[in-house]
UniProtKB/Swiss-Prot annotation:
An alcohol binds at residues 49, 68. Its cofactor is Zn(2+). Zn(2+) 1 binds at residues 47, 49, 68, 175. PROSITE patterns: ADH_ZINC. It comes from Equus caballus. The modification N-acetylserine is found at residue 2. Its main location: cytoplasm. Signal peptide: none annotated. Keywords: Acetylation, Cytoplasm, Metal-binding, NAD, Oxidoreductase, Zinc. This is Alcohol dehydrogenase E chain. It is found in: Cytoplasm.
Length: 375
C-alpha cells in the first residue's frame, strides 16, 4: 500500500531539551509539499555537531529531531521535484545548493544562502515543520533531521547517488568524510610532494589525512594528545604522528624543526582556539596554508599576531570541505564505488537506531570514531 500523500507515523529520536538524552518517540511525518522530498532513512552517522546541539553549543530551536549525516531511499516527492524520484538512493545535504544565490553562482563558494546554519530557524524553507509529536510541532535540524525513520527535506537539500552504493557506509559522505577530505583537496588544495600537519585525529581528521594522501603529499604528520589514535592515522596515510605532551617545547616549534622551517599545509580539526593559532604558526611563513576545519559555532574570539599573516601565510576555513553539495556528493559516492578512498577505517561501531544514546556515549568517551545507526 502506497504511503505517498499520507501522514506517516514512525519512530524518531526527539531532543526535548538541552543536556538530556534523546527520547525515542512516535512522530507524525507530513507528506512533502511542492519541491520537497520524503525520505526513508537507512543509516545515519553520529557527528560531533549533533552532540553540540545536545550540549547547547550549537544553538538551534528545540524540541528538535537532530542528525545530518545520513543516507536513505526516496519514499515520495512533492510536485515540481525533478532531480529525484521514489526509489532513488539519496544523501540529505545539510549545506543546500539552491543554484540561484550569489554563493551558488560563485565558482568557489559553497555555503548556499538557503542554509539553516547561520541563523537556525529549525524549519523547512517555507518556514514550517513536517514533524509532529504528542500534538506539538517538532523542529527540523539543518534542513535534514536524519534521526528519524522518515524525514522531509527540500529538493535543494538532497542528492541522488549510485543505486548500487552501500548506504550504511556512504552516509559518511553526508558530512564527516567530505568535510575532512575536501578541506585537503579543495580548500587547502594540497600539492604533490608537500608536507602536511593534521591536528586532531578523529573521524574528520582521518578524512583530512586521506585527502592529503590522495593529493600526493609526501609527509603527513598527525598531531594528537591521544596516542591510541596513531595506529589508525598511519593506516589511512599519516607518515608519522606526534603527541605534544611528549615535548618540553611548544608543538609548533617541534613541527617547524621536523619540516625544515614549517609545513606547507596545516589543518585544525579540533575546534580549539589555541590549536588554531598553533596550526597557523607551524606552517611555512612565506607560503604556508592553514585551514580551520572544525569549530563549535559558539566559539570565543581569539587573539593572534598579524605578523603571522604579513609574511605570507594563508588562513582559511570552509563548511563541508568547500564542496558544492548537490554537485559533489554524487561524484564522491562514485569515487568511493571506484575504490578511490575507503570509508571502513572511519566506522568503529554499528548500532540499531534505538540505541542512539549509547552511540553518543561512545562519542563522548572517545571510544568511537564514527558510530553508524541503522534503521
Amino acid at each position: 500500500m502506497s504511503t505517498a500523500g499520507k501522514v506517516i507515523k514512525c519512530k524518531a529520536a526527539v531532543l526535548w531539551e538541552e543536556k538530556k538524552p534523546f527520547s525515542i518517540e512516535e512522530v507524525e511525518v507530513a507528506p512533502p509539499k511542492a519541491h520537497e522530498v520524503r525520505i526513508k532513512m537507512v543509516a545515519t552517522g553520529i557527528c560531533r555537531s549533533d552532540d553540540h546541539v545536545v550540549s547547547g553549543t550549537l544553538v538551534t530551536p528545540l524540541p528538535v529531531i537532530a542528525g545530518h549525516e545520513a543516507a536513505g531511499i526516496v519514499e515520495s516527492i512533492g510536485e515540481g521535484v525533478t532531480t529525484v524520484r521514489p526509489g532513488d538512493k539519496v544523501i540529505p545535504l545539510f549545506t543546500p545548493q539552491c543554484g540561484k544565490c550569489r554563493v551558488c553562482k560563485h565558482p568557489e563558494g559553497n555555503f548556499c544562502l538557503k542554509n539553516d546554519l547561520s541563523m537556525p530557524r529549525g524549519t523547512m524553507q517555507d518556514g514550517t515543520s513536517r514533524f509532529t509529536c504528542r500534538g506539538k510541532p517538532i523542529h527540523h535540524f539543518l534542513g535534514t533531521s536524519t534521526f528519524s525513520q522518515y524525514t522531509v527535506v527540500d529538493e535543494i537539500s538532497v542528492a541522488k547517488i549510485d543505486a548500487a552504493s552501500p548506504l550504511e557506509k556512504v552516509c559518511l559522505i553526508g558530512c564527516g568524510f567530505s568535510t575532512g577530505y575536501g578541506s585537503a583537496v579543495k580548500v587547502a588544495k594540497v600539492t604533490q610532494g608537500s608536507t602536511c600537519a593534521v591536528f586532531g585525529l578523529g573521524g574528520v581528521g582521518l578524512s583530512v589525512i586521506m585527502g592529503c594522501k590522495a593529493a600526493g603529499a609526501a609527509r603527513i604528520i598527525g598531531v594528537d594528545i591521544n596516542k591510541d589514535k596513531f595506529a589508525k592515522a598511519k593506516e589511512v596515510g599519516a607518515t608519522e604522528c606526534v603527541n605534544p605532551q611528549d615535548y618540553k617545547k611548544p608543538i609548533q616549534e617541534v613541527l617547524t624543526e621536523m619540516s625544515n622551517g614549517g609545513v606547507d599545509f596545516s589543518f585544525e580539526v579540533i575546534g580549539r582556539l589555541d590549536t588554531m593559532v598553533t596550526a597557523l604558526s607551524c606552517c611555512q611563513e612565506a607560503y604556508g596554508v592553514s585551514v580551520i576545519v572544525g569549530v563549535p559555532p559558539d566559539s570565543q574570539n581569539l587573539s593572534m599576531n598579524p605578523m603571522l599573516l604579513l609574511s605570507g601565510r594563508t588562513w582559511k576555513g570552509a563548511i563541508f570541505g568547500g564542496f558544492k553539495s548537490k554537485d559533489s556528493v554524487p561524484k564522491l559516492v562514485a569515487d568511493f564505488m571506484a575504490k578511490k578512498f575507503a570509508l571502513d577505517p572511519l566506522i568503529t561501531h554499528v548500532l540499531p537506531f534505538e540505541k542512539i544514546n549509547e552511540g553518543f556515549d561512545l562519542l563522548r568517551s572517545g571510544e568511537s570514531i564514527r558510530t553508524i545507526l541503522t534503521f
